[in-house]
Amino acid sequence: MVPRDWWLEPWEKAAILEFHAGHLTEGYRRMAFMMLDADVVAASPSSVYRVLRDAGSIKAHKTRPSKKGTGFQQPLAAHRHWHVDISYINVAGTFFYLCSLLDGYSRFIVHWELRESMTEAEVETIIQRARERFAGERPRIISDNGPQFIAKDFKDFIRICEMTHVRTSSYYPQSNGKIERWHKTLKGECIRVKTPLSREDARRLITEFVAHYNEVRLHGAIGYVAPADRLAGRDREILAERDRKLDAARQRRKAAREASRPAG
């Protein structure tokens, strides 16, 4: 069998397995781009998958394609859509309200607050603080039909701020799935894992997780770049650099195999 340029060398396979051992909670796709960005191994997600599968470190499985957001017109730039949602956070048996705002284009967490109550006026305050962080932006606010968002005062607030507001259908909430997914990720990877013992502890943990989520964690829905990079417009440069690294690795493997062939 003739070796292909994308076939990994033994040291590359070993490096993948070693990296995986230190990142067991990461999926193979995210891990492939993490290694690529960190100059550990330049390998495609499919190559990483095969290495892990052959080593018995991953199981083949089929996932059903999600219909979340099907038919929903996605924003083409940052700060066009801000998704807002309220979720409950269980802290040592006491439930607090978490309100988050997420930029629909970059998945960047624009602002969040953890409170004992969450009235319509408090939601206004949270959105206003988010607007102060990004002065001059007038995003479309996307929410569910919670009581805070259907109140007349909230409608007046949106009008005064010269924004627009869209509420998801009661029978089709998928267009707000981005923020719902964020809350699910936060609870699954932070709150339930680290079990905060007080509201102050929860705020500290959420602050740390949001920083990691925005600045470091690679997001699959935006090409496995960090939300902050997408927000700042650095994603194209990152993707181009990855392509360059993958091509250079293929050329290096090809040259190494040609050099190892017996002279004839």
Regions found by a protein language model. Give the residues of each.
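Short hydrophobic alpha-helix segments
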Residues: 112-113
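C-terminal domain-tail junction helix/linker
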Residues: 2, 161, 185-264
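Mobile-element integrase/transposase regions
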Residues: 11, 41-42, 46, 50-102, ...
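Short amphipathic alpha-helical interaction patches enriched in hydrophobic/aromatic residues
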Residues: 20, 35, 39, 169, ...
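Basic, flexible linker segments flanking DNA-binding modules
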Residues: 1-81, 173, 231-235, 240
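Mobile genetic element proteins and their domesticated derivatives, centered on retroelements
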Residues: 16, 31, 48, 85, ...
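RNase H-like two-metal-ion nuclease catalytic core shared by retroviral integrases
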Residues: 6-7, 143-145, 151-158, 165-188, ...
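Residue-level detection of the helix-turn-helix DNA-binding "recognition helix"
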Residues: 36, 50-53, 159, 211, ...
